[in-house]
């Protein structure tokens, strides 16, 4: 197969080339530079940019206000949820057209999980497409335009997020009732 991004085949491109074409990725774990400050982590996200990215950084701080307060603090001293915010913020510094998130709420408290989903919705409202893999299927489908339920690596169900939430088979088999 091949991967198209805005009509361009990016299958064989290097990660840097994919980023320059508009793709950003936030891995599930080890997704911050622990010895760098919050601000330095965000700057790392802008490494391919040759313009003034201060406006983008301010947008990230508006999205995640706690990061502005902790901008000089090493990312390794942050909570799990705050580290996730740094990782998403760093990805947003690339000004992506597609943001890929791998288990963004893994290992965070329910309160932080709700806040992260709210922030993901805010990102979505800016027009950035979001491709998310998430174990918390109910909450992910609740914000999804389109959902895919995979079973042993194969796509079993595809529909709008709400339709999948309303699907009795999906509810019974994957959502606990």
Which residues are covered by each model-predicted region?
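ABC ATPase C-loop
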Residues: 91-92
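Conserved ABC ATPase signature
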Residues: 74-78, 82
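ABC-type ATPase nucleotide-binding domains, specifically the catalytic core motifs of the NBD
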Residues: 13, 38-55, 63-68, 159, ...
């Amino acid at each position: 197969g091949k991967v198209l991004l805005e009509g361009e085949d990016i299958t064989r491109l290097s990660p840097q080339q994919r980023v320059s074409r508009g793709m950003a990725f936030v891995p599930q774990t080890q997704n911050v530079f622990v010895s760098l400050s919050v601000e330095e982590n965000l700057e790392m996200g802008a490494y391919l940019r040759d313009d003034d990215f201060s406006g983008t950084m301010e947008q990230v701080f508006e999205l995640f206000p706690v990061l502005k307060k902790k901008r000089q603090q090493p990312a390794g001293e942050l909570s799990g949820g705050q580290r996730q915010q740094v990782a998403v913020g760093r990805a947003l510094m690339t000004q992506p057209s597609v943001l890929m998130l791998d288990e963004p709420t893994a290992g965070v408290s329910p309160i932080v999980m709700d806040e992260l989903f709210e922030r993901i919705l805010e990102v979505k409202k800016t027009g950035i497409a979001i491709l998310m893999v998430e174990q918390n299927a109910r909450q992910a489908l609740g914000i999804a335009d389109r959902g895919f339920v995979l079973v042993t690596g194969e796509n079993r169900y595809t529909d709008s997020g709400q339709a999948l939430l309303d699907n009795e088979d999906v509810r019974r088999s994957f959502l606990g009732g």
